[in-house]
Structures are given as structure tokens and as C-alpha cells.
């Protein structure tokens, strides 16, 4: 084998490894850092997984009251696919039933198009009812499939989480002006 052929073979192998690696989810995205969560819930003192759905975390203040929940949309059914696959969006759902914010986690969308989805689109989720009753953010031109998938995924995941017993009880209590303290445990 000549040096030229060997170089071409190595280059092809490296290209394949890079292409396969680009399709893999980003490492370290399994849990959102407390600093990011504090951006949505400044009084964060603890994060506790829900008993019924450990992938959904209750965000609690120093008194143990639930401020809301955080979860990644691609871990909650129904999962909506973008152009190239699932888009994992971190969602902060407040105890008042409003979306506090979203942050893109893992995705396999084309970087060229996905980068067109900017801060104004993400900000458009903030302070919207998680049930979608006050409309949804508009899709982004030139990234229509990805932005629509994100919107459908966020609101679909919110509806699923709001249907969980621990969450629906807290939302009902908040609607009635009651405290979000966890119920005392029986011995």
C-alpha cells in the first residue's frame, strides 16, 4: 500500500468517526446545572426527583415548597421529532402552571439551520401557560420543522407532566392559594 493510499484510507476513517460522533447526543447533558435552574427559580434550595417519574425534578425553596419542575422534553411522552430526530429541550415549569423558560439540550438537527433558532424564539416560551391556552411561539423561518417540533414537544411534555398526580395536586393547591409544602409522611 502506498503512502498516498494509506493517507486516503486514514482520512476516510477519520471522516467516518467524525460523522458518527456528530450523530451522538452531547455528553454531560443528563442533568442541568443548578446555575441554569437558578435562572428560572432564584430561590432554588433542592431538586428532588418525583416518585412517579424520576426524570422530572421538583424544584424546592428552603422551606421545602415546590417552586416548579424541570424536565427534558425528549424524556416525556409524546416525543416529537425534528427533521433529524428528537430534540431534547429542558423545560422549567412553574408551580403556577406557567413556563419559566426553555433551554436546548441534545439534538441532531443540522447546525446550519438549527442555529437560526435564536434567543427571541426561546424567550417566547417564557410566562406562557404550559397548557398552550395563550397561544404558542411562531415557527422560525428557515428552521420551520425544528422550531415547530420544539414547540409541539415542549407543550406536549408540559401537558404530560401537569397530568402527574404530584404535579396536578400542587397546581390545584397553587390555584387555590395554598402552600406548596410537601405533605407530611406517615410513620
Task: Annotate each predicted stretch with a short phrase.
Residues 1, 21-22:
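Accessible peptide chain termini
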Residues 22-140, 144-187:
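Flexible, solvent-exposed loop/hinge segments and secondary-structure transition points
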Residues 2-9:
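Bacterial N-terminal signal peptides that target proteins for export
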